[in-house]
Amino acid sequence: MHGCGNDFVVIDNRSQQLELHEDEIKLICDRHYGVGCDQLVVINSNNKKDISAHALFWNSDGSVSATCGNATRCIASILFKETETKTVNIETQNGVIECHKKNNQLVSVNIGKPKISWNEIPLSKDVSTL
């Protein structure tokens, strides 16, 4: 699927128990030897009230991403095709994201306020900011 210039491999895992490992994720995302994508997204079922689905996100290097706004819009689009509702809630590692169907081709998501303070942005290693 494509969302605002990003491309995703989306796996609907709601009716199965597929478990992917990092090497498999990297291979799927590889543009030369796999399908190729910016991120791999897995949609899982969810038994919580008012939650339509649970989503997991991986970057093409196999690392976990807590969420992705564009990928969440793609997942919401799939869910909207299955139901008449105009709002779905998708649970991610960053919490529940509320998604709205604006019309047949427009989906909006509320991913919250951006983190702009340097100490709120995760880094791969500790570094001095001075």
Give names to the regions the model predicted.
Residues 84, 91-130:
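ATP-dependent small-molecule kinase catalytic core of the GHMP/sugar-kinase superfamily
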Residues 1-103:
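A glycine-rich beta-to-alpha transition motif near the start of alpha/beta enzyme domains, typified by
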